Amino acid sequence: MKWLKRTAAAGMTAVMLFSCLPAAGAVQPGEELTRGETASILLEAATDYNADVTYGDILKGYPGGDLNEDGAVTRAQALVMLQRAFGGLPEPKGDNARSGYPAANFTDIPAWAQAELEDVLASGIVAGTSATTFSPDRKITKEQLELFLQRTYALEGSNLKDDFYATVNKEALDNSVIRPGYLGASAFYDLGAKVDEEIAGIIQERVDGGAKTEGEKKIVNFYRNILNIEARNAEGIAPIQPYLDAIDQAKTIEELMAVQNRVYEETGGTLFMGFGLNIDVKDNTAYTLLFDGITPSLGQGGYSTATPEQKAAYQTYVRTMLTLVGQSEAAASAAADTIWRVDAKIAAASLSNQELADVDKTYNIYTMEQLQAMFPRVDLEALFALTGLTQTNHIQVMDPGKLQAWAEIFDEGKTPDGLEILKTYARLYLAAGFGPALNEEFTEAGNAFSEAYMGSSGALSLEDSAAQYVQQVMSDYLGQAYVDRYFSAEAKADVEKMVQDILAVYRDRIETLDWMSETTKEKAIEKLDTVQINIGYPDDWDDTLKDVEILSAEQGGSFCDNLIAIQKGTNKLLAELQKTGVDENIWPMTTYTVNAGYLFTANSITFPAGILQEPFYDVDASYEENLGKVGYVIAHEITHAFDNNGAKYDENGNAVDWWTQEDYAAFQTLCEKVVKLYDGKESAPGITCNGALTLSENIADLGSVACLTEIESKRENPDYAALYTAMAEIWCSSYPRETRLYLAQADVHAPDKLRGSLVLQNFSEFYEAFDITEEDAMWLPPEERVVIW
C-alpha cells in the first residue's frame, strides 16, 4: 500500500540581494554620509539610467552657491537627491505596485519635502522606521542609501548588472495578474491553474454521464454535494449543533473531554489533542505513534511579527466564526482577544518551520505515562482506545515546547475562566474544521480573512472550489485519468535522462570536494547512488477510499457527511498501516501536483506529471532552457538529501550519523555562511529574508545551480547566459505585500527573487556571462560567495 497522508506543499516566494554597491571614498558601513559622499554614490549609481546627470544636478547648493559637501544629510534630503540623480522614478506597475511600501501611511513628511518627495514616496521604495513614521530628519547611513538604490534598480528593471531578476522579468512582473482567489502569480500558480482546469474537465465529464466505476461515482456524488449550496445553507450548523450544545453544558475538563471523544468517534475529528502515526525515522520500516495538541493557526512566527492590520484580520475572523456557531457578538469579541493571547503564548514556545524538519529537535519519545502526567485530568487511555491503533510505549512528540505550553493552558481548565478558554477553542475548531462543508457564510468568512490578512482579491467560484476539494481527496481516482490524458512518454524519458545526467555530475562533484574526507565522501556517494527516483506517476494505483461510502443527496448524503466518512476512513487506514509496516515505494504527492519533493525517510525524489510540462519542461525548448527550469527543480530536490536536515539521514532513509566529526563541523561552518548570505536580504521594501528559517532550501538551491553550471560547462559551446536567464524566469513571481509579510516569517523557501538571482551570484560563470564587475550592483565579493556541494 503506497498510501500516505498527503499535505499541501508550501508555496514558493521571491527576494533578491544587491550585496555590493558603488561607494565614494572610504565610507565604512554604518557611518553617516555627508552630502558630498551621497552625491558621489548617487552619480555613479545613476549613470546608466540618466546619462546626462551631473554632480551639481544632484547636490545643488544653498543660497549663495555653497554646496556644503561636508555637511550631514538626512533621509529626506538623500531621497530628494536620489530622485534628482535618476531624473525621476517610474510609476510602479504590477508586482512593484503590489509589494511596494505604502508611503501614504507616513505622518511625518515635512512640508518642504512634500512636493519633491511625492514621486519617490509613491514609487513604494521608501520603507519607514515604523509603520507610520519616515523619520525624515534622521541622518542617512551608507547601508540605508544602498537599500534605497537596490529598490530603485528593482523598480527600474532595465539593467541586468544592477538587478538581474527584475530586468530579465521586467515585462512579466509589470504585467502580472493574480487570479481571483489565488495568493500569487508565478510559474507554479499559473501551471497549477491550468492543471486545475484540466482536472475540473475530467470531473465534469464524469458528472455529465461518464461515471462508470465506483470511484468515478464517488467523484460525482462528492462534487454534486459540494455544489448543493441551497441544501447546505438550509442545514446550517445542524451537523455540529449537538457538539456545540454539549460544549456549552460541560462543567469540567472531564466533561469537555467527553465531547472530544464523542466528536472523534462520530466524525473522526479532534478538538484538543490526538494520536496519529508517523514513519519512525530511526527505523523507517515501521511506524511510530504520534501525539499532539493545539497548533496556533498563524504558526510560530505569525503572532510576534503580525502588523496591527494582520492582528485585526485574524481577530475579526475568529469573532465571525464564533458568531456563526451561536456566540453573541460581545462574547465572540472577548473570545477573539483571548484566542490571540493564548495562541501567541503557545506559538512562542513552538519550533519554527525549519526546526520542524530537524530530526534532532523532533524525535522526542515519550511513554503513555509521561504524557498522562502532562495531562492529569485527561483519560488518554480512553482517547487512544478510540483510534484503533495498537498501543506502544514509544510515542513521538514533535514539538515538546508547544505541547507543554498547551498542557499548562489545558490544566487551567480546572478554573471557570480556564474552562471557558477551552470551550472557546472547541467551538472554534468545530467551526474551522466543519465550516467549509456547512453554509456559505463560513466560506465567506474565510475569503474575507484571506483578503484582509494575505492581500488576496476575490474568491474561487463555487464550481472551481468544488473541483479543488474533489482533487484533494480523490486523487487515487483522478490521478490515473490525468496521466493518461496529459502526460507523455517522451516527457518521462527526457526527464529520466536529465535526472541521470545530474546524478552523474553530482557524484563527480562530491568526489572533488575539498572540505570532506574520503571516508565521508564514500558514504555520501553511497547515499546518492541509492536515491529512489519517482517520475510522473506510480507503478501501482491505490484506492484508499475503497471502503468509504460517498453518498449522494438522493441517498441521504451531504458535503459534511462525505467529509466525515472520508476522515473516518482515513483513521481506519492509519490503524491498518500500523500493522502492515511502511511501503518503501511511497509516493508522497498526487500525480498532478505542480511541485516536487525529497522524502528523507525513503531517500527518494519525486517529480509528478503535474510539474513536468511547460513552463518547467518543454520538448521544443533549448537544452539550456529546460536545464535551467526543470533541471533546477531536479537538482534542487537531489540536494535536499544533503542539506542541513537531509544530511542527518543515511542511504536507507534512517536518521543515522554517517559523518566524521571533522567533516560535519566543516559542513556546519558552510551552513553558517549560507545563513549569513541570505539573512536580511529584501523580498520587497522593508520585508527581509530569514537566513536561518530558509537554510535548507537555500542549500538546495545553491547545490542545484552548482551542479547545472558544471553540466553546462561540459557542453561544446556553453551558453551560461541562456541557462541563468532560464533560472531567473522560472522563479518570476508576484505577491501582494501582505502575503510577502506572511511568507517572510513562515516559508522555509527564500523569496523567488533570491532563488533566481542571489544564488547565481555565487558562481564566476554568472559574472563572465553578463560582464558583471565589482563596479556593478550584482557583484558579490568572492569572499562572501558560498558553494557547498
Regions found by a protein language model. Give the residues of each.
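Feature responds to low-complexity, polar/acidic, surface-exposed segments characteristic
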Residues: 2-115, 127-142, 149-156, 517
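Second-shell loop/turn segments in exported
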Residues: 27-29, 64-69, 104-107, 133-135, ...
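Stable alpha-helical elements in mature extracytoplasmic
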Residues: 34-38, 54-55, 63, 74-82, ...
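Sec-exported extracytoplasmic/periplasmic mature domains
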Residues: 43-47, 58, 83-91, 121-125, ...
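Short, solvent-exposed loop/turn elements at domain surfaces
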Residues: 47-50, 172-177, 298, 615
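Active-site-surrounding "flap" and adjacent substrate/cofactor-binding loops of secreted or lumenal enzymes
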Residues: 159-163, 169-231
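Noncatalytic, helix-rich "gating/capping" subdomain that lines the substrate-entry/channel surface
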Residues: 203-497, 501
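Intrinsically disordered, low-complexity linker/terminal regions across diverse proteins
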Residues: 400, 471, 475, 479-789
